[in-house]
């Protein structure tokens, strides 16, 4: 049969099997066939032959059975469908040979018919396996095609021989065959890695040289391998042909779908030999193993920081360059890594694919699910070497370590104040910008932090989720519960070095120290009065604004402070939680109990500088001093009369209003003063 001089196609080097023939191949023979066919296809692609990917290659890539109908095999080879070799092919042959000489990898010269003979070592040409004449011709044709189109040693088939090549490479048995063949005759001079083809070696060398000859025409991204460029193009074309049956998510590659499905099945086939921790992806296992070895082969040239993963180094380098090539189409925010963009996109879509099988809570990131699950398991794998305290998150341990080292890496550019926590730094910056993005729907009050708004809203709802196990008392804030529990334990870990006074709360201790230093850093812009605490300034400002955000739901009376509302509520409930140990008398306020106790002890800590008279209450001393100074700060708006005490003004005002709030239960007579009622009631008792 004469050879036609036409363009070489993939069919020159292709072998077809019928279903019956394919079944007779053992696993080793099938594997070899797959490798050879894919290799020949890649060789033609590499030297620039343009053609559509054949069906058989699709099948081999998807690991499907590549056999064809017997009629198709007959038609191809008995209808003269044979291709010759043109000048272009001969030039490519010469080019390949030059490349091999360049790398000084010379194998023993073998003829095409010898290749056919070696190939028969794995595919024995017996009457059982090759019942028809066209099959014999197929293998004969294959040998000739190799002889014409590729150097014999450029094909895996021709490497199967019992004798060694001149490099004395190690050999191994393949399948059940007693034949041996060379695996990697072409060595990389940089890292020593071996390859069975020169073209594979050429592609590998691009890792060392950084060469990326394949560029995307859409985004100019370059790749070292043509296959990677083809896969990349699918991102632009949105071609996602592999869909998950569980959640409907689609993928460009079948391998990505297989990895994704492990999220649903929970399969983790890759286990660490050191600690037996298992992973759903092999790459994650490889990264994990570096924790045990301590290996960090990837070092940053800018700052010297080392990483166990190459991808982590690449991501880190963008910190120095400021490069953020991945932009969100929704809001324009840019990211240094495509993975970060993918996670960010879920904030727009609301996608939360990772669900907790304990409580049903869903998360947008797998790492967040892992952290959440530790709430259920109680696992705290990150332990402090200094104090032994354990944490469920690595970031929490990092922040905790700063309490030992004193490190405060976050510094405010406005006031130079430094913080150990990033979130505290961000919150602090809002003081300078006066930004209060979180507003209460009930009263319109705005807050710097979301957590402050949540706590504030409990005033309106009355929610008190934190309950004391000792006495059952409930609190709206966890910090208040912790402080309260110290009353039961008697713990006062914070002691003043000046006077020895101890406190159960750190904040109270800090406030107390300002008594000794006299520090009052918080000034009122209205009247200039200074305060030692910002909370005290906030409360004081309400005296200027008249703001009373805390309203009693029983009588509608409003208060400027939550604590005042709580005290007022006891007038409705009759609650008197503070009991005197001496006489059993109960009080609604703690301060009232303290003042009462002085009646038993005789303590009078407040002394007048003018006359030396002492008082059990600070307010009594204040009123007494006005007797010396003549100060009368409380004026009647009706007649202008002034009083030294507000209680005296209140009584006086009843003369103008006619108010008589004190009623006799015996006769119903009313009085403007309580003392008058008491005097009147004696009439009924005598």
Curated annotation (Swiss-Prot):
SMART domains: KRAB (SM00349), ZnF_C2H2 (SM00355)
GO-annotated cellular components: nucleus
Example GO biological process: regulation of transcription by RNA polymerase II
Zinc fingers (C2H2-type) by residue: 186-208, 214-236, 242-264, 270-292, 298-320, 326-348, 354-376, 382-404, 410-432, 438-460, 466-488, 494-516, 522-544, 550-572, 578-600, 606-628, 634-656, 662-684
Main location: nucleus
Listed result of changing residue 87 to G: In a breast cancer sample; somatic mutation
Highest taxon listed in the record's lineage: Eukaryota
Alphabetic keyword roster: DNA-binding, Metal-binding, Nucleus, Repeat, Transcription, Transcription regulation, Zinc, Zinc-finger
Full protein name: Zinc finger protein 569
Organism: Homo sapiens (Human)
Gene behind this protein: ZNF569
């Amino acid at each position: 049969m004469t050879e036609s001089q036409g363009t070489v196609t993939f069919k020159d080097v292709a072998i077809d099997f019928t279903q019956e023939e394919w079944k007779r191949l053992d696993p080793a023979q099938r594997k070899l066939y797959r490798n050879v066919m894919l290799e020949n296809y890649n060789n033609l692609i590499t030297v620039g032959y343009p053609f559509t990917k054949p069906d058989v290659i699709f099948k081999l890539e998807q690991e499907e059975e590549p056999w064809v109908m017997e009629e198709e095999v007959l038609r191809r080879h008995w209808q003269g469908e044979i291709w010759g070799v043109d000048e272009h092919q001969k030039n490519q042959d010469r080019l390949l040979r030059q490349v091999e000489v360049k790398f000084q990898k010379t194998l023993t010269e073998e003829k095409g018919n010898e290749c056919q003979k070696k190939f028969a070592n794995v595919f024995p040409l017996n009457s059982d396996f090759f019942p028809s004449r066209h099959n014999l011709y197929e293998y004969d044709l294959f040998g000739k095609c190799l002889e014409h189109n590729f150097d014999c040693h450029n094909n895996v088939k021709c490497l199967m021989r019992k004798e060694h090549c001149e490099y004395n490479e190690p050999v191994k048995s393949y399948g059940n065959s007693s034949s041996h063949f060379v695996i990697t005759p072409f060595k990389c001079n940089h890292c020593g890695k071996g390859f069975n083809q020169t073209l594979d070696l050429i592609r590998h060398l691009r890792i060392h040289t950084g060469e990326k000859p394949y560029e995307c025409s859409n985004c100019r991204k370059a790749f070292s391998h043509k296959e990677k460029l083809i896969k990349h193009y699918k991102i632009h074309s949105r071609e996602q042909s592999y869909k998950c049956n569980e959640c409907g998510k689609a993928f460009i590659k079948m391998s990505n779908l297989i990895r994704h499905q492990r999220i649903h099945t929970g399969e983790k086939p890759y286990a660490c030999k050191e600690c037996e921790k298992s992973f759903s992806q092999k790459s994650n296992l490889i990264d994990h193993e570096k924790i045990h070895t301590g290996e960090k082969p990837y070092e940053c040239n800018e700052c010297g920081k080392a990483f166990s993963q190459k991808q982590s180094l690449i991501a880190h380098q963008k910190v120095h360059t400021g490069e953020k090539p991945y932009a969100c189409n929704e809001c324009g925010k840019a990211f240094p890594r495509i993975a970060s963009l993918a996670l960010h996109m879920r904030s727009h879509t609301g996608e939360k694919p990772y669900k907790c099988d304990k409580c049903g809570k869903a998360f947008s990131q797998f790492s967040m699910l892992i952290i959440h699950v530790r709430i259920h398991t109680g696992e705290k794998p990150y332990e402090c070497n200094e104090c032994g305290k354990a944490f469920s998150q690595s970031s929490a341990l990092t922040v905790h370590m700063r309490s030992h080292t004193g490190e405060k890496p976050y510094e405010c550019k406005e006031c130079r104040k430094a913080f150990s926590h990033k979130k505290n730094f961000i919150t602090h910056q809002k003081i300078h910008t006066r930004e209060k993005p979180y507003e209460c729907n009930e009263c319109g009050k705005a807050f710097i932090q979301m957590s402050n708004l949540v706590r504030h809203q409990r005033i309106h709802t009355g929610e008190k989720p934190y309950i004391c196990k000792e006495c059952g008392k409930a609190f709206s804030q966890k910090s208040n519960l912790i402080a309260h529990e110290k009353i039961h334990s008697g713990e006062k870990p914070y002691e003043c070095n000046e006077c020895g006074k101890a406190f159960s709360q750190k904040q109270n201790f800090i406030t107390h120290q300002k008594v000794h230093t006299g520090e009052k850093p918080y000034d009122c812009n209205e009247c200039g009065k200074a305060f030692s605490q910002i909370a005290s300034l906030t409360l004081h400002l309400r005296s200027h604004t008249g703001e009373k955000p805390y309203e009693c739901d029983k009588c509608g009376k409003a208060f400027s402070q939550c604590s005042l509302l709580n005290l007022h509520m006891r007038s409705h409930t009759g609650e008197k939680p503070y009991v005197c140990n001496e006489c059993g008398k109960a009080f609604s306020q703690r301060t009232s109990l303290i003042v009462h106790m002085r009646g038993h002890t005789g303590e009078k800590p407040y002394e007048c500088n003018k006359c030396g008279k002492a008082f059990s209450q600070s307010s009594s001393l204040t009123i007494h001093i006005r007797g010396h100074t003549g100060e009368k700060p409380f004026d009647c708006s009706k007649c202008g009369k002034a009083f030294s005490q507000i209680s005296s003004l209140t009584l006086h005002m009843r003369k103008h209003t006619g108010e008589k709030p004190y009623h006799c239960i015996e006769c119903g007579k009313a009085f403007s003063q309580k003392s008058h009622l008491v005097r009147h009631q004696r009439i009924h008792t005598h």
